[in-house]
């Protein structure tokens, strides 16, 4: 049999009961050996690949809808649809399906939609079709009961639907509706409401086509006004005829398109406003209604796209200066609805839609509209712009860069136009609208900031062999736009505190800082050059003095993001300008309050300590230690001081660092098990042995026991043990009885170096009140044994701690030592033997 090729779109129904477009191709029917039967084949028109191969199963229920649709279920919860470009192609494939199943092609459905039970199947064989009562006023109650009783059974629903179709019953019911309204027969109107609602739940396309026809749809809506659960009927028809006016902003010449728009609006209104909220059971019975609306929308968008005269007139009138304001507002609102309409389409359809709008010049038109004074028009234009950015940010970037290039070319010829040409850049208009938002809650500014963030996000920028969109666009953005974005920040931070500190200004600056923080994270050298050259961080930190905590935290978050990069260019800039001073001032001014500001500042310094950022550690201790040394409810600042002293010690004794490297390299060359064994033996050595300078190594490495290497290592380990004792003593200083409220004074003088290795300092440190076994307790006079000190440290960590407290992990190498000291005796004995 020869194939009949017809152009179709293939759809599948997803979990949300929405149709997904699987592609466009040509359908044919033929025998497929692998499937052992006649099948439907769809090959993609782009590359000829197979989009669909479906055997025409004799028991599958196929439905023909709206003359150009064939819908069926391949398996449970897997629905398919073919949408034909031409009715003739649909008819030919439908005839082929009916031929395989032995059905009359005049039917719209080939099988029952749901498998009925054996009992129902027997009843079907033994009983004739459903007989409807005569359509009379006196029998409305009987009809309503019949419809209600048929809904639970798939077989009875099918019989009822066939009876309603064959007898033209719906139109007769609508005639009775007029009679009931004229007679004010409320009981009859209530019965009609139940009947029409039940017909919707039959989920039958053929019935919908009758109900949604021009002559019937308003009467159907009228029946649904008389809900028995309501004391007064709804006035849906009055709203649709008097309030909801169809404005033809651009004349539509195609009467079929106009009728389709009217029908879709009304059916959507029925679904959203008229029908009661369906139950889960009823929701599944309204899938055909969803499909009806979906395919109508696809058709409308397609017909409008193909009408080039319509779109040309639309954009011409939008940008024409002679167009009056009311007309322009209507045009913009239409375009906004048109774009919103497209969001229901599948990706392929949306691509074609926005490509058409782009070719028609939507972005230049939006630029003109955004420059107008009418706030409503600008708001609608912003919504349209958001659709474009979400759909294809690269398209928007390409436009604004081309625009900037054109302006630069003009400015070379006419220097006086340089400022004007920069001011009219589309992206600068967006930034200005964000900055000038008059809404107290800045709803529009938040939306625009999100769009700008999408545009400057490198994650969605394209990269090709010849050029990189990221490099080109970011170069453009920092040259032409960044000064506009930072203008309100720079204007408000000329002094030591914000010149304007009202709530709306604070909200706006918080938005600007949020975008700048995003840039710090994603833009590397572009934002780095801008921050350092324009001294942006110093201006941002002025906002730490704001009375609005959320703005001060935004400023702190900006600096924290910069420090988190661990970039020495940034670090040198921070140190050169003494940019920790505003942070320390804010910390001291916050006093003894436990709040987010306190925690965030401590976390910043803790990050510097844990990551061992040497330059910042030295800068903080040398310049701010006097102001921070009394903070003892966390160990962060004392830990920073310890880091600083260790750095000094390494600088004073370079051999110490080299010995540590030798030791580490010597150990890392061996496998992990050997390393672990040797660590146990090393750290289980008696202190007396260490004092004598003897090292314990595994027999396998005795040949490597060079006196020139191991003698300095032994000295290093002695010094290391003294430091560990010192650190444990520092831990014991944590106050377990609650947080202190020391008085602070900011001092920028350098702190004096403390000798951390002196024996006297380790034995005279005060202990924590209430800590068992601490140096000051009666049970531990004089020096502290190793196990006692360790117990005290563990108790301190397990007790009550401050809001922000961190484990003291200055030396990564000490972790293994702590573990080894707690080994059971049996394990130690294994290595001592």
From Swiss-Prot:
It comes from Homo sapiens (Human). Regulatory subunit of serine/threonine-protein phosphatase 4. May regulate the activity of PPP4C at centrosomal microtubule organizing centers. The PPP4C-PPP4R2-PPP4R3A PP4 complex specifically dephosphorylates H2AX phosphorylated on 'Ser-140' (gamma-H2AX) generated during DNA replication and required for DNA DSB repair. The keyword Membrane does not apply. This is Serine/threonine-protein phosphatase 4 regulatory subunit 3A. It comes from the Eukaryota. Residues 1-100 form the WH1 domain. SUPFAM superfamilies: ARM repeat, PH domain-like. Residues 683-712, 733-833 are annotated as: Disordered. The modification N6-acetyllysine is found at residue 655.
